[in-house]
Regions:
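Single-pass membrane-anchoring alpha-helices
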Residues: 1-28
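Parallel beta-helix/beta-solenoid repeats that form elongated, surface-exposed shafts/blades used
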Residues: 27-196
């Protein structure tokens, strides 16, 4: 008859308990708890970096290694988000400006700004639309709307005058006023047509 000694039984039980505890054969799993790391880099199977988190920001990349998204903190302490196109050029910006106001900017595939929606230097809201060369074509803000031609000359102004009355002004191609429709200084309605020949 074979005799199994007590030491072998204890070792067998301990190894079984160790395996069960290591592989987590429990009804509930434990959380990692408080995990502290300086940064996290995410790579695909080929070793191409697909994402990075650390130093106050997060950045993602496409399969070619070009940046696609940046979320982080700027030098002034404000937060911002930048989106990039497939070539790695910035296409959109959402964040905090130098003076603390928020804004959104979009860019074309040449890297030129095409629109701006946000707080201006005068702390009022504004919307600006740019042409493909980056020149202002439309402006809406602080109680008025302006439009510009391809030479940068104002063509339309719609807004409020210093006396509080509304008015519309149109301008010819060289920036000279051609029509005025609005409220005069005496609160009367006025229509003026100018001969700029």
């Amino acid at each position: 008859m074979k005799v199994i000694d007590i030491k072998s039984i204890i070792i067998g039980v301990l190894i079984t308990l160790l395996i069960l505890s290591v592989y987590g054969f429990r009804p509930e799993t434990d959380e990692l708890g408080h995990l502290v790391v300086k940064s996290i880099t995410i790579e695909d199977d080929r070793g191409v970096v697909m994402g990075y988190m650390g130093n106050g920001y997060m950045q993602t990349y496409n399969t070619f290694g070009e940046p696609t998204l940046f979320v982080g903190t700027g030098k002034d302490g404000g937060g911002y988000l930048r989106a990039y196109n497939g070539e790695g050029d910035e296409s959109a910006y959402v964040g905090t400006g130098r003076m603390g106001g928020g804004y959104i900017r979009t860019y074309n595939n040449s890297g030129r700004e095409t629109s701006y929606l946000g707080t201006g230097s005068d702390n009022s809201g504004q919307l600006r639309i740019y042409d493909k060369q980056g020149e202002t074509r439309s402006y809406l803000g602080d109680g008025y709307l302006q439009s510009y031609n391809q030479f940068g000359e104002r063509t339309i102004f719609l807004g409020t005058g210093t006396n509080g009355g509304g008015y519309l002004r149109t301008y010819n191609f060289s920036g000279q006023e051609s029509i005025y429709i609005g409220t005069g200084a005496d609160s009367s309605g006025q229509i003026r047509v100018y001969d700029n020949s």
